[in-house]
Design a protein with these regions (language model features):
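Serine residues within intrinsically disordered or low-complexity segments
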Residues: 4-5, 18, 47
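Sec-dependent N-terminal signal peptides
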Residues: 40-49
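N-terminal signal peptide c-region/cleavage motif recognized by signal peptidases
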Residues: 55-58
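Sequence/structural signature of beta-propeller domains
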Residues: 62-414
């Protein structure tokens, strides 16, 4: 029989610094003792696995606190296709829609509780167009994410429609620059509608990070819905430097799928990225499964973190690019990607699932995230926004837009 006192001294707990983890040790002890009763009726190996799973889950769940989602409708914000969010400063946020009538962003003022982080109020301040119609403001676009460079007053937009990462001056509203896109991330290299969904910016190192939503054509034989459930989903997180050219690739392996792929709509990919104040990279993974009858739809979200020291280690392991002009001959083969991706250190921070069925109508397809306010106790909040597809629905059931706050434990950002 496995003694609970031994498990509480397990290395996972000894290396965990969360105060809430220590407060839960007593509760975990009760859980483990209950497991011991079950263990008497199970083989030794199986019982050990059961207890270790309980211990692992109890510790893992303490890296963040996921707060209840808040519907934007209560603040008279109309349904939209909100796909990205970024802080502008002083509680103001820019929100981009992938179906906006023209290129631009919505500005919201978001008030959060200083103790809990929960959203108290959202005030819509209008739509801010970028570029005049004469300079291409009504051109075909699919704005999926955005980041704000406060030092240079630039708003960078990830456009999946033409696979570009473009900067706009917030004063003149005009295009002023763009990141060089390496050939492996060109429109021809990504599966349809699985291109640039995410964009992040690190103010400390002044580097950008983006990726295709799902594996590239060269790295996977089919879209996620056409792959075996055991097939690895590896991405090339690409980082750009101050010269606007791609500098290196960070191999990244997504978590194993949890939902059924036999569905009307199925998605599995990375819709958002966010650099934390300490240089760590937060990755949002979204898996969505919508049955043919719609009832039973699920959206499973994960927040995973690549620690700052792991980012530096990956820099040494990853492939360095001399310039975007030579990336055609890049010796970063799919086999090398699949070999390196599992070596990138990743921490599971939080996860949640939304549903649409007879009794639950919490379904929300989260696509964007950014830094929220710091709480009074120093913890960092993350704001997540969902895409309701303009309130699509039928028979009186329509999707709603939500904001959800995730409160990170101090070890994620210190």
């Amino acid at each position: 029989m496995i003694e609970s006192s031994v498990l509480i001294k397990h290395r996972w707990l000894r290396t965990t610094r969360s105060q809430r983890c220590f407060l839960l040790l007593e509760r975990m002890d009760h859980v483990l003792r209950a497991c011991q009763t079950l263990c008497r009726h199970l083989p030794t190996m199986v019982s050990g696995m059961v207890v270790l799973v309980f211990a692992s889950l109890s510790v893992q769940a303490q890296l963040a606190q996921v707060l209840p989602q808040r519907a934007l409708k209560q603040w008279n914000i109309p349904p939209g296709n909100y796909s990205g969010i970024t802080p502008l400063g002083n509680g103001h946020y820019a929100v981009v829609s992938d179906k906006a009538p023209r290129l631009g962003y919505f500005e919201w003022k978001i008030e959060q509780d200083s103790l809990t982080g929960q959203v108290k109020q959202v005030i819509p301040l209008g739509f801010r167009p970028l570029q005049s119609p004469a300079t291409g403001g009504v051109a075909d676009h699919d704005a999926e994410d955005l980041i704000f460079d406060a030092q240079h007053k630039l708003l960078w937009i990830a456009n999946e429609g033409n696979q570009t990462l473009t900067a706009y001056n917030t004063a003149t509203k005009q295009k002023v620059g763009a990141l060089d896109i390496p050939p492996y991330l060109s429109s021809d290299s990504v599966f349809t509608n699985l291109g640039f969904e995410a964009l992040a910016y690190d103010v400390l190192t002044r580097q950008w990070c983006s990726t295709s939503e799902s594996p590239l054509r060269v790295d996977a034989p089919a879209r996620p819905e056409g792959l075996s459930p055991t097939a690895p989903l590896d991405l090339r997180l690409t980082l750009w430097g101050s010269t606007f050219s791609a500098q290196r690739i960070l191999p990244y392996r997504m978590a194993a799928p949890q939902l059924s792929r036999q569905a009307r709509h199925y998605l599995h990919g990375v819709p958002a990225l966010c650099f934390l104040p300490n240089g760590a990279l937060l990755v949002m993974e979204r898996e969505l499964s919508v049955p043919r009858a719609y009832i039973g739809a699920k959206c499973h979200l994960r927040l995973r973190c690549i620690p700052a020291d792991a980012m530096q280690l990956a820099e040494r392991l990853g492939s360095r690019l001399i310039s975007s002009s030579v990336t055609d001959s890049l010796v970063f083969s799919p086999s090398l990607l699949h070999a390196l991706a599992p070596q990138t250190q990743v921490m599971d921070v939080a996860q949640w699932r939304t549903h649409l069925d007879v009794f639950r109508r919490s379904f929300a397809n989260y696509e964007g995230m950014c830094l929220g306010r710091r709480l009074a106790d120093g913890r960092q909040t993350i704001l997540c926004v969902s895409d309701a597809q303009d309130g699509v629905g039928r028979c009186g059931v329509h999707l709603r837009d939500f904001l959800r706050v995730v409160v990170l434990d101090r070890e994620c950002t210190d």
